[in-house]
Amino acid sequence: GEDRITPAKRVALALSELISTRYPKDTLDILVFGNDAWQIEVKDLPYLKVGPFHTNTVAGLELAMDLLKRRRNPNKQIFMITDGKPTCIKRGKNYYKNSFGLDKMVVNRTLGLAVKCRKLGIPITTFMIARDPYLMQFVEQFTTANNGKAFYSSLDGLGSSLFMDYRKNKKRGR
């Protein structure tokens, strides 16, 4: 299949560079989510490999919300670069996975977090780097639930749309 991780890594690295040079008081945390979610340092991003993982968007959002809760920054936002529809959630100590279509249980948990972020005043901008019709359908529902934004970008055009959105949100004071 198409290489989706390389463009996503390039965008995250470029966003990191933009923020550290143009907006030095801002903080950027990079989170990776497969079956689970974890934080990585910018310096480790080039070495990130894709595993045989599902997409646990819930874990990524929960970790992002935890990090944002601890910050005193008035302007909080989430940029989510994703190449897959949500296919996995954790139930207790076990994983519930379903790669076929859009699983109602997985999607509903994910949409619930989109609504929670909206109520907390945390906009989510989603960048979709795949042309999967199920992913497009999910991203539309997710964006509506959060009142966020979505960019359906080609792998090449991903970077420029990300930076325009970041700068626009900075000017708006979000």
Q: What do the PLM-derived regions correspond to, one by one?
A:
Residues G1-I30, K49-N56, L68, V107:
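…and closely analogous acidic/polar surface helices at protein-protein or active-site interfaces
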Residues I30-V32, I78-M80, T126-M128:
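Structural beta-sheet core signal
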Residues V32, W38, N94-K97:
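Catalytic core of nucleotidyl cyclases, primarily class III adenylyl/guanylyl cyclases
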